[in-house]
Regions:
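STAS-like cytosolic regulatory interaction modules
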Residues: 1-50, 65-104
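ABC-family nucleotide-binding domains
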Residues: 53
Length: 104
């Protein structure tokens, strides 16, 4: 089961995911929130995900493209050494959510 915690702070939407991603419907909910509130910057914290499959990775990369089209920016927050390089070329990875404020 996927649990989502969302916090908006200083112009940045922090989305914290915990558990397992079973589909990409959570991205639709977040996208609606972004559109409704005009949010441009999103930090997707996947540090507490138990499992990230290839399909989920592709959905997140596609989601990044959508945010870029809206002149925004997506950052991945993850300290898991095994996953650090998954998004390296497509989406910047930060170790701590606070680092987002210096990159945005």
């Amino acid at each position: 089961m996927l649990r989502i915690n969302v916090e908006f702070r200083k112009g940045v939407l922090f989305v914290r995911l915990r558990g397992k991603i079973v589909d990409d419907s959570y991205l639709d909910s977040i996208n609606d929130l972004i559109d409704d509130m005009g949010i441009r910057y999103v930090v997707l914290n996947i540090d507490n995900l138990e499992y990230v499959d290839v399909n989920s990775i592709n959905h997140i990369i596609d989601y990044n493209r959508e945010i870029l089209k809206k002149h925004g920016r997506l950052l991945i927050c993850d300290t898991n050494i095994n996953r650090n390089n998954i998004f390296k070329n497509a989406i910047p990875n930060i170790k701590c959510e606070i680092d987002a404020f210096s990159l945005i």
